[in-house]
Every structure is written in structure tokens, then in C-alpha cells.
């Protein structure tokens, strides 16, 4: 589940029982991380990208990351996991806690200075996961990130023109709502 709220409840301050009292639109409940990993283990080619949400309290964000990483390690699933974080002040700390790749998500509606290549270099970030509009507004950043050997993902790429841009620029990952179209473009 991706949103900060569900049926008016803030997820970060609600219990799992409260959150799952009403099923999702498809009739399922929101799975636990352990349940999600159990299903993922049935598909060896799958890489699990875990988005550690930024909470209002940085201590809570830290606790969520630690608990998440603990479960991943307990289930011996580290080789199949990458993390996303959107809170730059905790990036270095989290990176020191795991050898798993951690991508910086950027701040969704704020462009500078956090997302500038100089800031990324200063933090030693090697994985980026930015909204497509930021790369498209600054194609020179793509060149710089590539020169700095930074692993790139763009989201959410939904037009053919945008898909062509990211394929031409050899992005490592492209997040889209139209995977069939993207796969067709990849096979050309």
C-alpha cells in the first residue's frame, strides 16, 4: 500500500488491525512484510523494492527502517531487496546499516537543492529514483549522473515519448503503468 492515509486513518499512527479492518478494493488485506516476502520467494527473478516512507518524526522513520531491515535479514532475503528512502538526512545512517542498495527518492514537489547532482555527489548516493519530470527538466543532470556511475530509475513514465527518452539514456529501471508497451519498446 502506497498512500499515507487509508479511509481517513494515518498509516504511521494506526495499528495493523485498524488498517486491515476493511479489505482493499480487490478483497485482500494489506500484507505484512513477512507475507510479501513469502510470496516474492516463489518468483526467484523478482527483486523487492521497499519504499521506507518518511514519517513525521525522524525517529519513527529510523525505527521503521531498522525493523524492516531486521525482517529482511531474518528471512535471508537481502540479495533480493533494494530500499528507497525520501529523507536525505538519514541516508548516510541507513547506508551504514546495510549493504543493500538504497536509492534516494528525492522530494516529490521540491526540485532544488536536494536533488541537484552536486548534493547527490556530496552524500555519496549511488542510486536515484526520481519522478520523470525532474530528469526531463534537467537532461544535463542525466549526463552528470551517468558520468558519476549512478544507478537511475524514473517514475512514472507513461508516454511513448518519455519511454523513448529513458530507453535512449539507458536508465537502469523505468517505472510505468504500461509495462507491456515498455517491454515492446525494449524488444525493438
Describe the role of every protein-language-model region.
Residues 1-101, 130-133, 146-148:
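Metal-dependent phosphodiesterase/phospholipase catalytic core, i.e.
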Amino acid at each position: 500500500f502506497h498512500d499515507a492515509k487509508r479511509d481517513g486513518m494515518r498509516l504511521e499512527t494506526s495499528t495493523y488491525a485498524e488498517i486491515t479492518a476493511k479489505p482493499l478494493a480487490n478483497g485482500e488485506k494489506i500484507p505484512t512484510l513477512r507475507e510479501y516476502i513469502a510470496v516474492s520467494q516463489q518468483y526467484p527473478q523478482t527483486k523487492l523494492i521497499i519504499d521506507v516512507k518518511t514519517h513525521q518524526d525522524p525517529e519513527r522513520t529510523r525505527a521503521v527502517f531498522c525493523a524492516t531491515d531486521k525482517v529482511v535479514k531474518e528471512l535471508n532475503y537481502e540479495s533480493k531487496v533494494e530500499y528507497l528512502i525520501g529523507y536525505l538526512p538519514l541516508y548516510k545512517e541507513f547506508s551504514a546499516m546495510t549493504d543493500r542498495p538504497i536509492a534516494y527518492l528525492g522530494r516529490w514537489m521540491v526540485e532544488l537543492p536536494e536533488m541537484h547532482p552536486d548534493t547527490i555527489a556530496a552524500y555519496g548516493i549511488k542510486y536515484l529514483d526520481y519522478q520523470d519530470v525532474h530528469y526531463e527538466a534537467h537532461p544535463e543532470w542525466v549526463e552528470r549522473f551517468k558520468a558519476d556511475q549512478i544507478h537511475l530509475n524514473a517514475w512514472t513514465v507513461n508516454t511513448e515519448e518519455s519511454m523513448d527518452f529513458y530507453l535512449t539514456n539507458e536508465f537502469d529501471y523505468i517505472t510505468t503503468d504500461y509495462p507491456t508497451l515498455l517491454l515492446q519498446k525494449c524488444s525493438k
